[in-house]
Amino acid sequence: CEAMASIRLDFDVIESSTPSTNIHALIGRNGCGKTTILNGMIQAVTNPDNTIGKFIDTGYRLEREIESDYFSSLISVSFSAFDPFDPPEEQPDPSKGACYFYVGLKNREKKDSLRTIPELRADFVRHLVDCFRKKDKLVLWREAIRKLGTDENFESVGLIDLEEIYKQLREINKLEQVDSTEFRNLFLSEIESYLTSLSSGHSIVLFTITKIVSVIEEKTLVLIDEPESHLHPPLLSAFVRTLSELLFDLNGVAIIATHSPVLLQEVPKSCVWKINRVGDTLKPYRPEIETFGEDVGVLTREVFGLEVVTSGYHGLMSKAVDSGRTYEDIIIDYENKLGLEARSILKAMIIHRDKGLSK
């Protein structure tokens, strides 16, 4: 992608910083090139000789391209059924350089097809068993599930019970290898009721975190494409916090492509790139304001600017003001059903109109 070749994005991770700097965000409207950048990053790690984009290590006096083992592994996460990018084959062998793992819907064995729910669940169980049979992974998984419990609906499913079911099943089937297909199928049948009770968003979070815990090592890079497409805001925030603390423990970093201001609330502006497209050229900018903990409405205006003012309820307010009516008349037209934000915007627009200023 020529547009991508002309831009530079810096990602600085500062040790023990508050707030944490191990989650970075690329934000912009649909079609601005965020997913293209992420896919270029995947190619830069998995196939560096045949790609335009490069990762550069800036920790030296003379900057240089990273070595093949700079990242221990790369994990890409995308549950979009419409992304034309075909993920590479998984590469789990550290002797060949950075390992590569994919979390998502694409079926790499059957081009242009998606994985079924039974296939996704079978893959989840395989990685869940991997977490349960290794003490260090089990500790990470338990802690991740506990943190995700800040989302009440997630906690109510009782996913921490899965560990006890695994232990009981292993005790009953002592002669069965836990990594055998037979044991995994048996385990899946025992926990299926838990999985079917999950919403699609909760399933995606559980499957994603479990696979990440299963394969993550020191210095892992995680790339995630638009997680908000499937997650409501509290679950998105819980997921980002959980991921950040998991990466902190293992000296890893995540880069997330998003169009959700909710996600920006979880990261400082030094970790945010606004991506704008002008024709075929991509232009990255840092936000003008601090993003960590900022109001969603403020962040929306910061990122999308005029697009917000000319769309949705802003457009309706503008049209009502252009009709020449008074503030009180417009409130009556809307049967007193305007929120505080809409009323504030309406008042400002009317003041500007009556003074002969542009809105």
Per-range role (PLM):
Residues C1-S17, S68, F82-P88, F101-S203, ...:
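Extended helical coiled-coil dimerization/tether regions that scaffold
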Residues S6-D57, E65, E182-L316:
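Switch/communication elements of ASCE P-loop NTPase nucleotide-binding domains
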Residues G40-A44, N50, P92-L114:
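Extended low-complexity acidic/polar segments
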Residues I52-P88:
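AAA+/P-loop NTPase substrate/partner-engagement loops
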Residues S73, C99-F101, V253, C271:
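Conserved beta-strand segments of alpha/beta enzyme cores
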Residues S76, Y102-G104, K274:
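Structural signal for conserved beta-strand scaffold positions within catalytic alpha/beta enzyme cores
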Residues P87-C99, S270-W273:
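Short secondary-structure boundary/capping segments
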Residues T116-E152, E245, V262-Q265, S270-K359:
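RecA-like P-loop NTPase motor core
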